[in-house]
UniProtKB/Swiss-Prot annotation:
Key word Electron transport present: yes
GO molecular function, one term: protein-disulfide reductase activity
Gene (name only): trxA
Source superkingdom: Bacteria
NCBIfam families: PRK09381.1 (NF006898), thioredoxin (TIGR01068)
Protein name: Thioredoxin
UniProt xrefs under PANTHER family: GEO12009P1
Cross-referenced PROSITE patterns: THIOREDOXIN_1 (PS00194), THIOREDOXIN_2 (PS51352)
CDD domains: TRX_family
BP GO annotations: cell redox homeostasis
């Protein structure tokens, strides 16, 4: 994983995501999820490309089972963009880099 991506947990979610300055993209994922593995390199690139404009976080749903239901996560990968502690936009499924960039550019 990229040094530009922060692993968050149920315990750190409030501090790392909800209280963050600026927009935060959260990737809800699991080790066994094929599409989650496909999107991982795309997230690494986006984390580098948007450094300073966007914080990118990953939350493993198997290890952190309290947070996903609070935000209605039903399928993975789910990408949620948070601003000022609120969900601004959500995408479910693996996206290409251009699809993810378009999603981010429209919402940050």
């Amino acid at each position: 994983m990229s040094e530009h991506i922060v692993n968050v947990t149920d315990a750190s979610f409030e501090q790392d995501v909800l209280k963050a300055d600026g927009p935060v993209l959260v990737d809800y994922w699991a080790e066994w999820c094929g599409p989650c593995k496909m999107i991982a390199p795309v997230l690494d690139e986006v984390a580098r490309d948007y450094q300073g404009k966007l914080k990118v976080c990953k939350l493993n749903i198997d290890e952190n089972q309290d947070t996903p239901p609070k935000y209605g996560v039903r399928g993975i990968p789910t990408l949620m963009l948070f601003k000022d502690g609120n969900v601004e936009a959500t995408k479910v499924g693996a996206l290409s880099k251009s699809q993810l960039a378009a999603f981010l550019d429209a919402n940050i």
